Amino acid sequence: MKSQTAESEKSKKYDRQIRLWGEHGQAALESAHVCLINATATGTEALKSIILPGVGAFTIVDGNTVTGEDVGSNFFLDSASIGKPRAQAATLLLMELNPDVQGDFVEETPENLLEHNPGYFSNFTVVIATALQEKTLLTLAAKLWDAGVPLVVCRSYGFIGYIRLQVGEHPVMETHPDNVLDDLRLDRPFPALRAFVDSINMETLTDKEHSHTPYVVILLKALDEWQQQNGSQTLPKNSREKDALRDLIRKKVRVKENRASEPEENFEEAVKAVNRSLNATVVPREVKELFEDEACLTITAESKPFWVMMRALKDFVENEGDGALPVRGTLPDMTSDTDRYVKLLNLYRAEAEKDVQAVYRRVQQLLNTIGKPEDFITEADVKLLCKNAHAVRLVRGRSLAAEYDAKEAQVHTILTSLDSPDSEIIFYVLFRAVDRFYNQYNCYPGYFDDQLETDISKLKASLGQVLQEWGSGPVARDDYVHEMCRYGAAELHAVAAFVGACAAHEVIKLATGQYVPLSNTFIYNAMTAASETFLL
């Protein structure tokens, strides 16, 4: 009884987010262990936004002690913490946000950990990195790339924010697309649906039954009549044909005894649904591309569960599905009496379950072939894929090593964007120049007030070096160089809070396997409240 009460309280606590990613998404988040490297203002804001939703555990790796500068920009450090280990101080205060979350800290620099315990970071679900020098960042990124652990790099620098997501192969079965067409199969009704629609004689219905007939029935009957009139088995393709179908539906509105044609909401819904519900049942291009991927075509003992399921889905489409994906088993809201709506809904659900079982059988056959246990992939996994097969996506990211390699860098994208005066790419280039400056002088430009003018000249030189490596001439952006030096690498809390929250969104996407992560670089300009993403 106590356990049930605890679960009920937990559901109430996380109710709003469970509506977004479901109980299974919440369970995935609660099983995640996130590492934060360096408890900067941006880093702790990112942790805050994943601790509040209930991430399972977090660990802060930081070898620094708290300074007055830290306290001035970081809400999760106070004056009593000055001189204490920053990892410990931040962990203790962050843990107060949510007693359900486990917190830990390591008082060690990431450089030291990478040198003496290089596999340490491979044990986390996601790693968030802040305030790392370029050399350390690239070393960490390479190890995480090889280990298959996602890395989220975030940074706030004056009025500018930056997020870089490094993830190798990341399948997303629940993408939650904004605009989804109904999956009613009206162009190819399955036997149970056809029998249900044919069993309803609209002429013999009472007025009440007539005005409460689900629009799916009205639409399919009208489509049958339209196809018969036109000698075709296809769907209406152009506006003229769709208008003709709408006219057919409107003519079916019953004229009452007083000879007045009263509005019937279900018929109005049928007219509106011509565009939304009368769509061809096809396999989307993105899903076809996954079917033709070498990882899908060649299943081995090393294949990941996602690819085994995709191969089973491909085989289903080519066989039982007759060229179509599994039925989703959902039905939109509509004007209808309860009895017929429930019957119709159960028909779709039964057909969806039949398709799930067909795909699951194929999954089991594949697992048996490659010598994997049956529970390697559960029926629930297959059901989730079948329900979302129309929108499944695979993210294949680029490594930081490729981005920083002059031969593999997306130079064309960068230089083309630089030609646009409104593009935020200039700040990405300046971040690269700032890191080059730090590597040369062991401090950030503008950090010391008395060296500001000298640093401006030095940063211009660093910027020129970066551009030269990309085969570009100098860029006349002196005002931006001055601005970066004026920042002096300071973290403004308002910017850090925004960037940290955005980084937390990406961590949650990765941990839950839902929603498509950004690809792959995000720049935020707080001066103009503008942001832009780039694939770098």
Where are these regions (language model features)?
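Adenine nucleotide-associated cytosolic modules
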Residues: M1-L536
